[in-house]
Amino acid sequence: MHSISEIVFQLTDKNLLMGRMVALIESPFEPSEDYVERYKRVTDMSLDQDTVKNLNNLTPEQHRKVRNIIRWQRIGCIVVKISETLGVSLKEALDMFYRSETCRRFHDEETGLYLQGNLYVLNDFLAEIGSPV
């Protein structure tokens, strides 16, 4: 079995870090044979057998760790877009995002914001701060 970091690398290396894939990863973990087929349908692409086996063999705790790693990677992407859009430093963008209601909702799984793509979250943040961009 591969480590959590190897699994995350496999996922990101295959450019699967998009809203639809994150929605599946964030869903409650149900080890079953149809998990692989659901994963393929959601991502619209086939994965190599090693990646599929690794995803299916995760414990619930490991599954949660993968979800959290992906969430933090997404925050980095969102912060870069905030910096570019508003013309502020990365540090300022990070500070702005972490102090926002949008960030709070992004971490709260009950709101469903984490299921949306990075640009959707960015637009929510920009609307929250009243940016005309």
Question: At which residue positions do the language-model features occur?
Answer:
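N-terminal cationic leader/targeting segments used for protein routing and processing
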Residues: N15-L16, R41
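C-terminal alpha-helical interaction appendages
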Residues: I25, Y35-V133
